[in-house]
Amino acid sequence: MAGKNSGMPDPTLVAELRRVASLQKTWVASAEMTWVDAGGRPRGFKSRDRLALPDGSQPASLFVQCYFKPSGIQGCPDKLSLSLFFKHHRVLAVDENGPSGHINVFGVGRPYFGKRVGHPQLHTISDDAIDGYAEPLESMSLERYWDYFVSIAGITGAPPFRLPTLQLGLPV
């Protein structure tokens, strides 16, 4: 933290996270997304895959984490979260979570500070908070969210988006 009780993140950390987020990264995991059961009702699925930096290094704390949960409500979008993590911080994310949202209490001086932002959303770092500021996105297909995320995260070599295998017609 910048000050003992300031609540502000360390500016050096914010700068480092932004620098890594802006670098070109290479997908070094498998040639397809590997989903694992995350439990819940309806059942959710998660995927976590490593990335390499331009120098070839693969920091253990640099990865893409995805979460998918089919909607249990007809006409309500499925839940999808696509996140870039570095040093245990969510530095960039695209989230779709149906008819929900939050008020941006961080991001002073940014366009959506103090405003309610529904889903879908783009999460980025602010000077006053590493996570917690979101801007609205246009609704799109899950595949397009993935393509958009991979593009803005600067990730090359990522596999195409594939949903986890669901047991259609059976309760999950």
Report the location of each language-model feature.
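Charge-rich, low-complexity N-terminal segments
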Residues: 1-63
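Intrinsically disordered, low-complexity, compositionally biased regions/tails
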Residues: 43-44, 48, 60, 102-105, ...
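Broad, structure-driven detector of short, well-ordered beta-strand segments within folded domains
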Residues: 58-73, 92-95
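Intrinsically disordered, low-complexity, charge-dense segments enriched in Lys/Arg
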Residues: 113-172
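Residue-level recognition of well-ordered beta-strand positions that form the cores
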Residues: 50, 65-67, 83-85
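Intrinsically disordered, low-complexity segments enriched in small/polar residues
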Residues: 1, 5, 37-38, 42, ...
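Short coil-to-beta strand junction motifs in C2/discoidin
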Residues: 74-79
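An exposed acidic His-Trp-rich patch
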Residues: 80-136
